[in-house]
């Protein structure tokens, strides 16, 4: 299912924006609510969707609306480069968007090119139990207000951690299975959760 999302993100500016909208909408939002929220996005767009009108989500939506073409072009350039550091370049590319820290920039890297991964609150509880997940992104991956050099160093550490936790595919499968267990009334299986991702961005 990830390749379908990837294709959507890479086919057009509109496709990339919709994948970004899914990523931003998913921040601190229960997964079963994403179907309704993405319907609202399709109806009202980036600057009208209710879930994207507050705090950092609003800042990100405004930025993306203004810079979407150049951001899409930059994303495609990284993908076409096929360099060994393309994963790092991509997560740093998405880290430019206001409101996206390393976990969600990693999620966008996962969605648009099948690399990276998302260390969301569920994965932080699982892989870093000593960290207080209620406080959001752990200090080791905080990038707000930090130098480009520090962001790059933290991104390298983040991507290494994702690989140890199973890589983009492993994290995707584990997360989908976990969400299905958490919300059995909403999802039949992890495969069901996975198959919804292309629908959310269609």
Region annotations inferred by a language model:
Residues 1-55:
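Structure-specific DNA junction-binding interface
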Residues 20-29, 62-65, 176, 180:
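Short, amphipathic alpha-helical segments that act as regulatory/interfacial helices
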Residues 1-7, 58, 65, 69-202:
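C-terminal accessory module of base-excision DNA glycosylases/AP lyases that mediates lesion recognition
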